């Protein structure tokens, strides 16, 4: 059993309990009023708690901004360092009785050796609450899959969604996060990984059954550091000798199609005669032009469609095996063997 122990409204609580609010605030009681109003609305599950949360949490950032009237770096450092020290104190109380999986700014994820140990955990946390003036919240989880502290998916016990259909699992990191329209890159791979962890569905099943072309896209952009994109150049390896007579291997590029567009919707291709897509800076290094650089996380063989692909059918050329391999490579980072 896993338990996520979070400090409720941590930074605002520290500012109030330890008087670490910016010294430029003339009436701290107003901040306390916002704090308690938000807690009341949250307990009622009232969505109006959200704007109060934004006001409370943005205060810390304002104290670090020298252009803000609330600028007070000493108090901001008190909040940050003091908060971490209090959390470290809690970790030291718990570590002999459970396994610490990870910690972050305002919480700790622990693994209980036995479910019966929860009462002991609760007692230790209660004692910490009495000493510090903070309040802890608990969430129980059944499984944790973790690549590192910033990339994980935590699966709850019981239903995966609440009564409103909102996901009860927690995830963080590029491999498993839900993508928005602004960062809709390789969504089919993310979905394959999440389906594997939540439902035990193989990446092959998720990817092969997908019929939405947009879900396979990787969007890349030519930044201002580069002149243009180059599609499908011939790439060869050659051995030469440097000025000291030592043998070394170099990569040479020839041909390819210069692209005038700056943004590309890239897809993996089964056609081995098609190459990858590269960005060209045109910089001169040691008397010769710097080699083109391959766009990150793009296939060696690809095609691109820069028009709207919303209703386009999946072309036979799309290499779904490429996406399956990417999904398994990322699962391996979580410790899953193919």
Question: Which positions does each model-derived feature cover?
Answer:
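Hydrophobic, well-ordered secondary-structure scaffolds
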Residues: 7, 12-31, 105, 115-141
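C-terminal, non-catalytic extensions of nucleic-acid polymerases
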Residues: 49, 88, 111, 116-338
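Helical catalytic core of nucleic-acid polymerases
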Residues: 1-96, 100-101, 111
């Amino acid at each position: 059993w896993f338990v996520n122990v979070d400090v409720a409204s941590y930074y605002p609580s520290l500012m109030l309990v330890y008087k670490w609010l910016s010294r430029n605030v003339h009436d701290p009681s107003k901040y306390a009023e916002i704090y308690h109003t938000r807690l009341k609305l949250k307990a009622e599950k009232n969505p109006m708690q959200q704007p109060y949360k934004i006001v409370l949490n943005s205060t810390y950032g304002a104290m670090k901004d020298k252009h803000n009237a609330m600028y007070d770096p000493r108090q901001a450092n008190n909040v940050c360092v003091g908060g971490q020290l209090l959390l470290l104190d809690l970790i030291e109380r718990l570590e002999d009785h459970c396994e610490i999986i990870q910690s972050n700014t305002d919480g700790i994820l622990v693994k209980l050796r036995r479910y019966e140990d929860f009462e002991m955990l609760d007692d230790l946390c209660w004692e910490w609450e009495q000493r510090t003036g903070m309040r802890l919240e608990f969430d129980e989880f059944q499984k944790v899959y973790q690549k590192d502290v910033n990339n994980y998916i935590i699966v709850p016990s019981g239903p995966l969604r609440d009564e409103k259909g909102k996901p009860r699992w927690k995830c963080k990191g590029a491999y498993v996060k839900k993508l928005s329209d602004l960062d809709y890159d390789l969504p089919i791979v993310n979905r394959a990984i999440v389906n594997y962890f939540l439902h035990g569905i193989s990446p092959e099943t998720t990817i092969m059954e997908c019929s939405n072309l947009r879900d396979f896209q990787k969007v890349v952009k030519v930044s201002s550091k580069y002149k243009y994109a180059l599609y499908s150049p011939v790439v060869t390896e050659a051995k030469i000798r440097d000025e000291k007579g030592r043998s070394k291997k170099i990569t040479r590029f020839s041909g390819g199609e210069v692209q005038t567009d700056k943004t590309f919707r890239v897809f993996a291709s089964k056609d081995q005669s098609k190459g990858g897509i590269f960005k060209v800076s045109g910089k001169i290094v040691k008397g010769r032009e710097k080699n083109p650089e391959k766009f990150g996380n793009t296939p060696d063989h690809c095609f691109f469609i820069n028009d709207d692909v919303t209703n386009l059918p999946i072309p036979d050329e799309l290499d779904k095996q490429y996406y399956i391999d990417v999904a398994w490579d990322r699962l391996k980072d979580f410790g899953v063997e193919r």
